[in-house]
Amino acid sequence: RISYSLSGTVIEQMELFRPDVLQSFVELAKTGCVEFLSETYFHSLSFLFNKDEFERQIKEHDQKIEQYFKQKPTVFRNTELIYNNELAAFIEKMGFKGILCEGVDRLLKDRHPNQLLKPTGTKSIKALLKNYRLSDDIAFRFSDKNWSEWPLHADTFASWIHKVAGNGDVINLFMDYETFGEHQWESTGIFDFMDHLPREILKHPDFGF
């Protein structure tokens, strides 16, 4: 499943300058195969300074998401995945079912990022952790000719994912939208890679996409 995190300000920019791009996201929403995450309207750090402003921005953002995409976000993504347990508890009280955060090795210790975790001090909200190694293989290493795995093909990447079978709940790949076409140019083959990846992942009976 694909999740998009679009700030309120980027939606405003699309309204003003690229309504065709905004419409492309509307069409994606209609497929039922993508979801839109909640975040602060201005991609801000407001939770660290003013929680009332933080809550106001989230509500304003989610109204924008519902206006265009007819979805009410259930998962929250803070700016740059900044996280602590206090934030998770606050977000849970606002009605969210999940929150995204980094899968930091030194904090996970004997756990791994492919597990759904319940943050301390919460009742039922789940923390969805970024698998940074697999994410960075696409976001940063994909076109690196000095990388031992270059050139990376979809079937190879899917085989790495399949190794998690039976030892995790979900594999979260987080990357900036600019990964596709800017960090990794079209000439690298990134678009063909992404086109083939879902079907390669689905070749294993234990996996969904």
Predicted features by range, described:
Residues 1-74, 81-136, 143, 151-167, ...:
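Catalytic alpha-helical scaffold of carbohydrate-active enzymes acting on polysaccharides/glycoconjugates
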Residues 176-190, 194-200:
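Glycine-rich, aromatic-lined ligand/substrate-binding cores of catalytic
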Residues 138-144, 183-186:
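Short conserved micro-motifs at the rims of enzyme active sites and ligand-binding pockets
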